[in-house]
Amino acid sequence: MRVFVARQPIFNRKEQVVAYELLYRESEENVYSAKDGDQATTDLVINSFLNIGIEKLTEGKRCFVNFTESLMFSNLPTSFNPKQLVIEILEDIPITPALISRCKELKKMGYMLALDDFYAINPQDEDLLEKLMSYIDILKIDFLKTTRMERRTILQTYGCRGLIFLAEKVETRKEYKQAVQDGFQLFQGYFFSEPRIISGHDLSTHFYSYYELLNELSKEQPNIKRVTEYIERDLSLSYQILKFLNSSHSRLSQKIESIQQAIMLLGFNEIKRWIYILSFKDLSRKGHSSKHEIIKISLIRAKLCELLARKTSRPQPASYMLIGMFSLIDTLLHREIEEIVQELPLKDEVGQALLGHQNDYYQMLELVKLIESNNWDTCSELGNQLDKEEAYECYLEALEWCHNLMDAK
């Protein structure tokens, strides 16, 4: 049996990513099996996390992990470094003296504890809830299930305890601002990917240099001298192209004597693809953490689209990278997607998919969105050509590829 893992970022008030919630499921079912299967599931989760690597999944940040009642009393929580893990106690776990004792034990070991979906908790004994609260660090409150008045009541009731309040399923900027005003410190949801209307936002100067180069590369017969000139006038770009050539041609028998020679060895299509990647990486150095996170998601989607296209033997698999890469470009630039598509030298089918036309590129992007949200049941409906195990390996490869790319100097 295989455990599939995805992640969702958690932000602070400065919109910096401070943690990730790890979402995991069994390969075929969305629930854990009976008690006898809990230990097997525990072993699977441990093995999967060790094989993938917590560092790779969370990039050195804390990870939030949901625990069922049985798993709370297993060895799974203590298999992680306390500095890496926040233990989420599910709202349907009965509050008992045994649970309180277990939480006390975990707190002594240095673990942070969070109560998931706090408003949904309906304790039979208020005194037991009070005792449990003395060991809780974080209260997670679901924005989709509560009103603003209900949330404010919770914050007023428990605000004096020094707890951290996390607003989850925050889907819009309006909800995010509301949560900040009401006193929440952490935020989870896709509010950060919602376009904001802000005047003066545009692409960086470097991006326009890349764009100029992309325009030339998109012609039926690009002028190699002009392409060479564009690259040679940018020292960083020249260095990156040569570095990429060296890494992609490990058995290169000849020494590179000029940028033009490097271009001829790589080919226009490969250079064009790499320029798209470099332009996004350059853009990620500017702006705050939420923009950085959007770029990471875009790059992961880009690589995953390409890998899945290769796995399913689609023609021109490298072209599928573009649909993932530009899937959030309107959010990054705070502009209408229609304007952006008109300006960029994109393949017609890719541009149409970005505009919502349900062609094969659009379907691929939808499949990737399902994978990143760990929605494997619907994935099987969209991607019937693909084995779940293979798709998951592609997801992990895309995560690692993005991590290596963003960390490269």
Curated annotation (Swiss-Prot):
Pfam families: EAL (PF00563), HDOD (PF08668). Transmembrane segments: none annotated. Residues 1-209 form the EAL domain. It comes from the Bacteria. InterPro entries: dGMP_Pdiesterase_EAL/HD-GYP, EAL_dom, EAL_sf, HDOD, RNase_Y/CdgJ. Residues 203-392 form the HDOD domain. This is Uncharacterized protein YuxH.
